[in-house]
Amino acid sequence: MKINKKNLIWIDLEMTGLNPKVHRIIEIATLITDTNLNIIAEGPVIPIYQKKEHILVMDEWNKRIHENNGLIKRVEKSLYNEQKAEHETILFLKKWVPIQVSPMCGNSIAQDRRFLFQYMPHLENYFHYRYIDVSTIKELAYRWNPSILDKFKKNHYHKALEDIRESVVELNFYKKNFLKFKKK
């Protein structure tokens, strides 16, 4: 284990919906990659306890997905609130990356950042202000080379750790098949 300012922090949140003023975080996971997108550490996967009233505001899609994958049951039994989950996550990150150095990495992570700003401001502050958003590259591929999208199929787990692992794989796919950087 070595702190490296070039390591990348990947994050995924599962939420009860998309509006941070109404909805809440129900799961968080992080992992660390090196600059070549090799996973070097996986952080804690933490279901976050939420009161029943916060669970009840979920729309039908979220209820179905999170009941089917067992997340709602894990949330109901969790001993972690947002602050404790934030603290545990930061303790993990401090082992691998200095504060405010790594961009926030993942899929549609601007959405995650909105929730971090609302409910986990210390964690939000841990990241650099930049992003590496795999969704942006996917949108560019859709517009500039749509046939490439047929070659990568997502599993849509809607579980935080599985989703960020898949985001790393997806970015590797785009790196090799769409961005095609020349080796030095």
From Swiss-Prot:
Gene Ontology CC annotations of this record: cytoplasm
Domain of life: Bacteria
Span of domain Exonuclease: 8-171
Main localization, broad class: cytoplasm
Stored InterPro entries: Exonuclease_RNaseT/DNA_pol3, Oligoribonuclease, RNaseH-like_sf, RNaseH_sf
Enzyme Commission identifier(s): 3.1.15.-
Biological process (GO), any one: DNA metabolic process
Protein name in UniProt: Oligoribonuclease
Organism this protein belongs to: Buchnera aphidicola subsp. Acyrthosiphon pisum (strain APS) (Acyrthosiphon pisum symbiotic bacterium)
Taxon lineage: Bacteria, Pseudomonadati, Pseudomonadota, Gammaproteobacteria, Enterobacterales
Gene: orn
